[in-house]
């Protein structure tokens, strides 16, 4: 009984927290993460996609450990 009551209070609290922290409280669940949704629709907009990597055919390996190959396969040259 106590566990059920605690779970109910926790769910109500988390639901209220979602609406309070939303940008627009009227459409709280729709506008909760607008920037991330934009990055999912346009992957080129994500900052993590802008990484430094070496293209195929370029030397890589022991004397030159970084930047990594774009394909992540290095056998003396990026493949």
UniProtKB/Swiss-Prot annotation:
Stored Pfam families: Conotoxin
Q: Which residues form the propeptide?
A: 23-51
Q: Which residues form the signal peptide?
A: 1-22
Q: Listed GO cellular component terms?
A: extracellular region
Q: Sorted alphabetically, which InterPro entries does this protein's record hold?
A: Conotoxin
Kindly list the places in or outside the cell where this protein is found, as annotated in its UniProt entry: Secreted
Q: Which intervals of the chain form a coiled coil?
A: none
Report a single Gene Ontology molecular function.
toxin activity
Task: Write out the entry's keywords from A to Z.
Answer: Disulfide bond, Knottin, Neurotoxin, Secreted, Signal, Toxin
Per the UniProt entry, the disulfide pairs are 53-70, 60-74, 69-78
Please give the tissue specificity annotation from the record for this chain. Answer: Expressed by the venom duct.
Q: What is known of its domains?
A: The presence of a 'disulfide through disulfide knot' structurally defines this protein as a knottin.
What family is this protein classified in? Belongs to the conotoxin O1 superfamily.
* Name this polypeptide is given: Conotoxin Leo-O4
Q: Which organism is it from?
A: Conus leopardus (Leopard cone)
């Amino acid at each position: 009984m106590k566990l059920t009551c605690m779970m109910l209070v926790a769910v109500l609290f988390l639901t209220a927290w979602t609406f309070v922290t939303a940008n627009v409280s009227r459409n709280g669940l729709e506008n909760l993460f607008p920037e991330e949704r934009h990055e999912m629709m346009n992957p080129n907009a994500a900052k993590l996609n802008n990484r430094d990597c070496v293209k195929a055919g370029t030397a890589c390996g022991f004397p030159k450990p970084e930047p990594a190959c774009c394909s992540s396969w290095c056998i003396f040259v990026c493949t």
